[in-house]
A protein has these predicted regions:
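Short, structured coil segments at secondary-structure junctions
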Residues: 33, 68-70, 85-87
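Hydrophobic helix-and-loop "lid/oligomerization" segment in the mid-to-C-terminal part
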Residues: 1-25, 131-303
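Hydrophobic/aromatic beta-strand patches that form the interior of the parallel beta-sheet core
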Residues: 16, 52, 71-75, 90-92, ...
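A short, gly/pro- and small-residue-rich
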Residues: 54-56, 64-81
Length: 303
């Protein structure tokens, strides 16, 4: 989006992000692009003439954005949220597998020559969001990938995808595996308290690869929020709807058919370890009820 603003209208742009950037692949991507991004808390929004939100929406639990600010542009591939409708311009394509695909079509329509770093970043975005075009992808995602890949830096892309992982990554992974319980064709794992939510989603992806498993739910606590990730290969049920139900009225939840997330606030009275375990147990029961047999006994994945 900044490429269009710069190339077509000579408009200077600042890029902000919500939360900390901790995932190894994202850090490697920022390093390759040489991007200097700032957290939303550091930005003085009154200095800007226009505000755009990309690959996210206002009102989502993973976006710390001042609700009193009106957005000019929202572009995303997740199902539309009520707060998004107040933006001056919205382009929400929930059938698309990646927001990078939407932005590629903008660049193509504007007849802008896509620089190698931008092409590399967009290829990574499509690969990451669709798991190499194997999940929630469309013909548009495939066409964008095929057009962008020849323009990308394959060696840099490899360094991003295979970015070195910090040792604490494996400590968190061990917890996810140790805590994983199998309920028939479903796996549930509570990772405890974490610094950031990235591992919760990564664990859900990994556990879904277990033999004979069709659903995974992983949970973890970050600050005063209980984060939930859902993954499935079951075409008969919709992960996004289940996530919304799990989140309830006080939380945030939603997503696609095959992957979804929920964020549930923990107030002062219910954020003790005991209260969190009770909440996780309740969410597990509701998840099992929504995805099949709720009375199935859990067995450890790793004996």
């Amino acid at each position: 989006l900044r490429e269009i603003a710069n190339e077509r209208h000579d408009i200077a742009c600042s890029i902000g992000h919500s939360g900390a950037v901790l995932r190894a692949e994202n850090l490697a991507l920022l390093k390759y692009l040489g991007l200097k991004t700032r957290s939303l808390e550091e930005l003085e929004f009154s200095r800007f003439d226009r505000l755009s939100m990309v690959d996210a929406q206002p009102g989502a639990g993973n976006v710390a954005f001042d609700a009193s600010l009106r957005l000019d542009v929202v572009i995303d591939h997740h199902p539309i949220r009520p707060a998004t409708r107040s933006a001056r311009f919205t382009d929400i394509r929930s059938r698309y597998g990646a927001t990078s695909t939407i932005l590629y079509e903008y660049l193509k329509a504007a007849r802008i020559d896509i620089p190698t770093p931008v092409a590399t970043a967009m290829v990574y975005g499509i690969r990451s969001d669709t798991q190499d075009l194997g999940r929630e992808s469309t013909r548009a995602d495939l066409e964008a990938f095929l057009d962008l890949y020849p323009l990308a830096n394959a060696r840099a892309l490899g360094r991003i995808v295979q970015a070195p992982l910090p040792r604490n990554y494996f400590s968190k992974l061990r917890i996810a595996l140790d805590q994983a319980k199998v309920y028939g064709s479903r796996i549930v794992s509570f990772l405890g308290r974490l610094e950031s939510p990235e591992m919760i989603a990564e664990a859900a992806d990994l556990l879904l690869r277990a033999e004979d498993v069709r659903w995974t739910m992983t949970l973890g606590v970050v600050d005063d929020w209980l984060h939930v990730s859902l993954r499935t290969i079951d075409r008969d049920r919709h992960a996004g709807r289940i996530a919304r139900n799990l989140a309830g009225r006080r939380g945030f939840g939603g997503g696609h058919q095959a992957l979804a997330a929920a964020q549930i606030p923990l107030t002062t009275g219910n954020n003790s370890d005991r209260q969190i375990r009770i909440r996780v147990k309740d969410l597990t029961k509701r998840f099992l009820r929504a995805t099949g047999n709720p009375k199935e006994t859990g067995k450890r994945l790793c004996s």
